[in-house]
Amino acid sequence: MDAVSSGTSQANRPRSNRGVGIVTAADSRERSLGQLHVYDGDGKGKSQAALGVVLRTIGLGICEQRRTRVLLLRFLKGPGRAYDEDAAIEALQQGFPHLIDQVRTGRGDYFSVDEVTRFDRQEAQRGWDIAKGAIASALYSVVVLDELNPVLDLGLLETEDVIRSLKSRPEGMEIIV
């Protein structure tokens, strides 16, 4: 029987670690911070999932005056190409410049392993150097490394270096790959 039909309210129901339902940030007594989110697979949705966390973090910074700041580092999404989410990100940056930074690296077109150039390697390294600095600085509460998995698949960065840096992130920092 669910809470409505049994006459008990959600507040009076015993809480368990398992089950079905939605616990909002307002309902949660403890926020789980410092997670490593990995979104992978074919098709759309990975970047949008990361942007949902970005939006939540910015909302916390606005509403609760928490010390939050987001780095949105977008590998393989150079300035030569427009993306659907660009206008929303730019609006957030204009409205709340103290809460979000964005860096785009790479060229604007798709390429395969056979088409990797020196520029691609330099841009991937430039982005990774920024990411490592952001992680080490502890300035950000959330660091999004959009398209990092394809960068690794293309062999543009050393996987072990990436893993080492992700493992050494400050306590409480969320990283989204």
Task: Kindly label every feature range from the protein language model.
Residues 2-35:
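Extreme N-terminal, non-catalytic leader segments
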Residues 34-134:
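Conserved P-loop
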